[in-house]
């Protein structure tokens, strides 16, 4: 038996659909409004776009998928804090090693290319 305060999946799905539609309409209103009011100041239009997009994101955040996305973002931020980032010295050393290996490989490939060009020229008699 379900609790009285729990939403049924159908009503939740319908509410989410309506919220996504409202978020889309708000975002579309930002784009269309920016186009239609092109003669107004850029600052006013930018403020309108920011407000409408913020409202669209706010509405989208109240949906089931929006709440899941916010939860995922919070968990991701916690994981980023756990990462042990390299020091500046380690980063510079690794970068210099990659640069040196890239230069050596470029010289090796250039040499092989030169040898192959000479072999083809020798074989074709050019």
Swiss-Prot record:
Transmembrane helix listed as a keyword: yes
Gene Ontology BP, a term: protein secretion
Record's keyword annotation contains Signal: no
TM region(s), chain numbering: 20-40, 42-62, 97-117
A Pfam match: SecE
Keyword annotations of the record: Cell inner membrane, Cell membrane, Membrane, Protein transport, Translocation, Transmembrane, Transmembrane helix, Transport
InterPro entries in the record: SecE_bac, SecE_sf, Translocase_SecE/Sec61-g
Membrane-topology descriptor: Multi-pass membrane protein
Localization annotation: Cell inner membrane
Gene Ontology cellular-component terms listed: plasma membrane
Single GO MF annotation: protein transmembrane transporter activity
HAMAP family named in the record: SecE
Subunit-structure text: Component of the Sec protein translocase complex. Heterotrimer consisting of SecY, SecE and SecG subunits. The heterotrimers can form oligomers, although 1 heterotrimer is thought to be able to translocate proteins. Interacts with the ribosome. Interacts with SecDF, and other proteins may be involved. Interacts with SecA.
Function: Essential subunit of the Sec protein translocation channel SecYEG. Clamps together the 2 halves of SecY. May contact the channel plug during translocation.
Assigned protein family: Belongs to the SecE/SEC61-gamma family.
Name the UniProt record assigns to this protein: Protein translocase subunit SecE
Primary gene name: secE
